[in-house]
Design a protein with these regions (language model features):
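STAS-like cytosolic regulatory interaction modules
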Residues: 1-50, 60-97
């Protein structure tokens, strides 16, 4: 893998559902991004349903990114995502305003 690929910014756009049924699919996408990029942008604007597994997936992703010195930022977050993160006490850990 070239240095150019390592310095590009990756984008992940979530569909309307981020729950246990989608966790394995997103785990693969997120893991690939960690291997390929130094900066990742997440678009969670379309999320209409998220459960504990979805929040755990995001939390694990943020922790893995931190250990690999990969920067993550949100392009957008849906109200559902914001409320779920707030209720679970994860807004800080998930860098959600």
């Amino acid at each position: 893998m070239s240095d150019t690929a390592q310095n590009t910014e990756g984008l992940i756009t979530f569909d309307d559902t981020l729950d246990i049924t989608m966790a394995a699919t997103y785990f693969e996408k997120l893991t690939e991004m960690l291997d390929q990029h130094k900066s990742i942008v997440l678009d969670g604007d379309g999320i209409e349903r998220i459960d504990g597994a979805g929040l755990q997936l995001l939390l694990g992703f943020f922790k893995a990114a931190e250990s690999l010195h990969v920067t993550i930022k949100w392009q957008a977050c849906s109200d559902i995502l914001k409320k779920s993160a707030k209720l679970s006490g994860m807004t800080g850990s998930l860098a959600i305003d």
